[in-house]
Design a protein with these regions (language model features):
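Short loop/turn segments at strand-loop or loop-helix junctions that form parts
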Residues: 11-15, 93-100, 131-135
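Short catalytic/ligand-binding loop motif for oxyanion handling, primarily in non-cytosolic enzymes
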Residues: 50, 102-104, 137-139
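C-terminal accessory extensions appended to soluble enzyme cores
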Residues: 108-120, 125-281
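Surface-exposed cleft-lining segments at the edges of enzyme active sites
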Residues: 67-72, 93-107
Length: 281
């Protein structure tokens, strides 16, 4: 948060609990304000009533508005629900969240431009952001090794930016986390996986389990991923990227700690954010 500074931060806390008069979001907002953060609560149209009430309560108290996440289908029906939106559009950041469907949307070609070009009252919103992610929820079914997946969300955003929209379209994604990913119901041992972002693609490394037939030690698999990453001809390493520095250290020294699942998620997310910041205008 120290690095984030005063930059606006959207937060959807709808998965957390609360009552009609008190939601976890209220406490989060209070602590964020005390820390000097510019938190804007985010919600979907279908948000639970208790959470929707807390979002409105925080918005009225903090005076920073609301971020509204809608689906592609809800763009077409905007004229029917915008009349019930509780605060002015000028105080609302609209997020068109394609989630994991972004690759399917890209496959539609130029026909997908129409909903964005005809976005109802497009210039009335405080901001409009396209979000999505092409990382699968699970690598089950993927072959062992490295698979390159296109950054479909960046492809779509780039195409829409060139489609003569009459509003500025901002970019958002899920970094290297699958939009539908979950940690519930996962029983070990599990394959050792990792994800790394280059300019046009995600490099998705699918490994094997650490126990049982065909297994390999976790450390051995992570070190192999690091060695493959540093040898990528189009890697474009970033000098001040912590994630890149950690991966370089793992590849450079056979005695360095090769990391664990949580640390490799951190390396991948940090690298993704730093690279994307360099790519966006």
């Amino acid at each position: 948060m120290d690095a984030w500074g005063k930059t606006t931060l959207f937060l959807d806390a709808s998965d957390l609990g609360g009552t009609p008069s008190k939601h976890a979001l209220d406490d989060i907002s209070s602590k964020a304000n005390a820390a000097g953060l510019s938190l804007v609560p985010s919600r979907k149209l279908s948000a639970p009533p208790i959470y929707a009430s807390s979002v409105l309560r925080v918005a009225k108290h903090d005076g920073r508005g609301i971020a509204l996440r809608i689906s592609l289908n809800q763009i077409a029906s905007a004229a029917t629900w915008m009349g019930t939106w509780p605060i002015p559009f000028s105080e609302t950041d609209l997020i068109i969240d394609l989630a994991s469907s972004v690759a399917t949307v890209v496959a539609l070609g130029p026909t997908i431009f129409s909903p964005f070009q005809s976005l109802h009252q497009a210039t009335a919103w405080r901001s409009v952001t396209l979000a999505g992610g092409n990382i699968p929820a699970t690598l089950s079914g993927y072959t062992v090794g490295c698979t390159m997946l296109p950054r479909a969300e960046l492809q779509l955003w780039t195409s829409l930016r060139a489609a003569n929209l009459d509003y500025q379209l901002h970019f958002g994604d899920y970094a290297t986390i699958g939009p539908d990913a979950t940690t519930e119901g996962i029983e070990g041992p599990v394959p050792i996986n990792a994800k790394y972002t280059i300019r046009p693609d995600y490099a998705v490394f699918h490994g094997v389990k650490t126990k049982g037939p065909g297994s390999k030690p976790r450390d051995q698999q992570y070190r192999a991923y690091a060695n493959l990453i540093v040898k990528m001809p189009n890697r474009d390493p970033l000098a001040h990227c912590w994630g890149d520095q950690m991966i370089d250290a793992i590849a450079r020294s056979a005695t360095s700690a090769p990391g664990n699942p949580a640390s490799w998620v951190s390396y991948g997310v940090n690298r993704h954010i730093e690279l994307t910041r360099h790519q966006l205008p």
